[in-house]
Amino acid sequence: MCPLRNLLLVATLVLLNHLDHLSLGRSLPATTAGPGMFKCLNHSQNLLKAVSNTLQKAKQTLEFYSCTSEEIDHEDITKDKTSTVEACLPLELATNESCLAARETSLITNGNCLTSGKTSFMTTLCLSSIYEDLKMYHVEFQAMNAKLLMDPKRQIFLDQNMLTAITELMQALNFNSETVPQKPSLEELDFYKTKIKLCILLHAFRIRAVTIDRMMSYLNSS
């Protein structure tokens, strides 16, 4: 093949590759970060810090309760109730929005994390799922703290900073969903079991807080 044909072939391939990227770019939902998203990023960072501090304190205080990540039985209270991990995939990896949409209830979105008129469906779905996660954990932690306050040993309580951080991020998201409010699990008042359950929940919630913080960082940089 002559040099001219080689040059034309390379130029054609480069052009086709460029057009393919442009087509892909047009097919992706647009997400524009605004001041509200930056505020939510700050709240998610505060939440991750508060959860990490609370978990560290629990591991130190409950050192004889098998409270390390290697010792506990991992449990996700949001399993089969929310789809945060799937809904919060980066937009370029989310290939089937309709499958995710089918798993959600209708939503009324008033959150200041959203940029009016510029937020994709996938972003809204992700943030609403995060809100539902926070709501479930908040209910569980409040019920658990009520039990811990009845413990004669007064050994450990939940850090108010963590509960406040959850509330602040929920307020920033400000989703009003039609889902039925979650009820805390009703168990026998066994303080040993409650403390073990606290460790399990804190480990699970910290993992979820990492996911939330990473997603807020991603949306803020979009």
Curated annotation (Swiss-Prot):
Its main location: secreted. One of its GO terms (molecular function) is cytokine activity. GO terms for biological process: immune response; interleukin-12-mediated signaling pathway. GO terms for cellular component: interleukin-12 complex. It comes from the Eukaryota. Residues 1-25 form the signal peptide. InterPro entries: 4_helix_cytokine-like_core, IL-12, IL-12_alpha. Disulfide bonds join C40-C113, C67-C199, C88-C126. Keywords: Cytokine, Disulfide bond, Glycoprotein, Growth factor, Secreted, Signal. Gene3D superfamilies: 1.20.1250.10. Glycans are attached at N42, N96. It is found in: Secreted. Heterodimer with IL12B; disulfide-linked. This heterodimer is known as interleukin IL-12. Heterodimer with EBI3/IL27B; not disulfide-linked. This heterodimer is known as interleukin IL-35. Interacts with NBR1; this interaction promotes IL-12 secretion. Heterodimerizes with IL12B to form the IL-12 cytokine or with EBI3/IL27B to form the IL-35 cytokine. IL-12 is primarily produced by professional antigen-presenting cells (APCs) such as B-cells and dendritic cells (DCs) as well as macrophages and granulocytes and regulates T-cell and natural killer-cell responses, induces the production of interferon-gamma (IFN-gamma), favors the differentiation of T-helper 1 (Th1) cells and is an important link between innate resistance and adaptive immunity. PANTHER family: INTERLEUKIN-12 SUBUNIT ALPHA, INTERLEUKIN-12 SUBUNIT BETA-RELATED. Belongs to the IL-6 superfamily. This is Interleukin-12 subunit alpha. It comes from Sus scrofa.
